[in-house]
A protein has these predicted regions:
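Short helix-capping/hinge motifs at transmembrane helix termini and TM-loop junctions
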Residues: 25-26, 56-57, 82-83, 109
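Cleavable Sec-type N-terminal signal peptides
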Residues: 10, 14, 18, 92-95, ...
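Interfacial helix-loop-helix junctions of multi-pass membrane proteins
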Residues: 32-38, 76-96
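Alpha-helical transmembrane segments of multi-pass membrane proteins
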Residues: 19-23, 49, 70-75, 98, ...
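"…centered on the first transmembrane helix and the immediately adjacent amphipathic helix/loop
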Residues: 1-54, 67
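Membrane-interfacial alpha-helical segments at the cytosolic side of multi-pass membrane proteins
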Residues: 43-58, 98-109
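Membrane-embedded catalytic cores of phosphoryl/pyrophosphoryl-handling enzymes
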Residues: 55-56, 60-78
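Short, charged juxtamembrane terminal tails flanking transmembrane helices
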Residues: 113-120
Length: 120
C-alpha cells in the first residue's frame, strides 16, 4: 500500500470521527455556529470525497452512495438530539460538496493522466 493511500485512509477516518463529534454534540461549538452552516457541510463532504478517492479509489457512485448514507445518518441522529434537528438542506449541501469533489478529482485525473484515466 502506498504512503498516500495509507495516510488518506487515516485522514478519512479521522475526518469521519471529527465530523461525528461536531454533529452529535447537543449544541454546535461557537466556532462553527454561524451563517456558514451549509458551507461547512459542503467543505466537509468535499474533503471526505477526496480522501475517500485517494484512500480507496472506489467507483464514483459507490463513493457518493457511502457519503450520502453518512450524511443521512448524521441528520437522523440529530433529529433526536436536543438543540439539533433533521435538515434536508444539510444533506443537499453534503452531496453538492461531494459532487464538487468528484469534479475536482476528474479534472486532476485528466490533467495528470490524460483522458484515458478519467471516469467521464
Amino acid at each position: 500500500m502506498s504512503r498516500v493511500k495509507f495516510l488518506s485512509k487515516i485522514c478519512f477516518f479521522a475526518a469521519l470521527l471529527a465530523i461525528d463529534i461536531l454533529a452529535f454534540t447537543p449544541k454546535s461549538p461557537a466556532i462553527i455556529e454561524n451563517s456558514w452552516d451549509k458551507a461547512n457541510h459542503f467543505l466537509a463532504f468535499f474533503v471526505l470525497y477526496i480522501l475517500l478517492y485517494l484512500g480507496y479509489e472506489v467507483k464514483i457512485l459507490k463513493n457518493l452512495a457511502l457519503l450520502l448514507a453518512f450524511g443521512v445518518q448524521i441528520e437522523l441522529v440529530q433529529a433526536f438530539l436536543p438543540n439539533r434537528s433533521f435538515s434536508l438542506l444539510d444533506i443537499v449541501a453534503d452531496m453538492i460538496g461531494a459532487a464538487f469533489g468528484v469534479i475536482v478529482v476528474e479534472i486532476l485525473k485528466r490533467i495528470y493522466y490524460g483522458k484515458s484515466k478519467a471516469s467521464f
